[in-house]
Amino acid sequence: MADLFFGGPFRRILYGRPFPPDWASASATAAMDWVETPTSHVLRINVPGLGKDDVKVQVEDGNVLTVRGAAPHAAAEKEREREKDVVWHVAERGRPEFAREVALPAEVRVEQIRASVDNGVLTVVVPKEPAPARPRTRPIAVSSKL
């Protein structure tokens, strides 16, 4: 009975190649957490298998933080797959490169941003500008001429 459903034309629909190898854009996005502490913004981005030389972090005009990464073997692997007579059956692992842009708040110290990679997680620490001192209000006694 299962052969009736999973065999023939249904097998091709259910298990066939739904998308060509380039179904995803060249730049996929990476999962990210963004938390704000009293002194900084902390971004943690999943970069499995990438080291510090495989990730580029920069701030563009308008306080846009850009993070890009690519596996060192990605280009060579991609070329080998194009040269061979390769048939893709499943493509679930995503692309070996990614890009992520984050609009940072205006009150950050761009020149003090730090980034590090550890166990497949890129951590970017963006220090905040200190809050401006609140103006102190002091009552002034008003006298009248009598």
UniProtKB/Swiss-Prot annotation:
GO terms for cellular component: peroxisome. Keywords: Peroxisome, Stress response. Pfam families: HSP20. The keyword Nucleotidyltransferase does not apply. It is found in: Peroxisome. A motif (Microbody targeting signal) lies at residues 144-146. GO terms for biological process: protein complex oligomerization; protein folding; response to heat; response to hydrogen peroxide; response to salt stress. PROSITE patterns: SHSP. Induction: By heat shock. Its main location: other. Residues 23-143 form the sHSP domain. One of its GO terms (molecular function) is unfolded protein binding. InterPro entries: A-crystallin/Hsp20_dom, HSP20-like_chaperone, Small_HSP. PANTHER family: HEAT-SHOCK PROTEIN 20 FAMILY MEMBER. Belongs to the small heat shock protein (HSP20) family. May form oligomeric structures. This is 16.0 kDa heat shock protein, peroxisomal. The lineage of its organism: Eukaryota, Viridiplantae, Streptophyta, Embryophyta, Tracheophyta. The gene is HSP16.0.
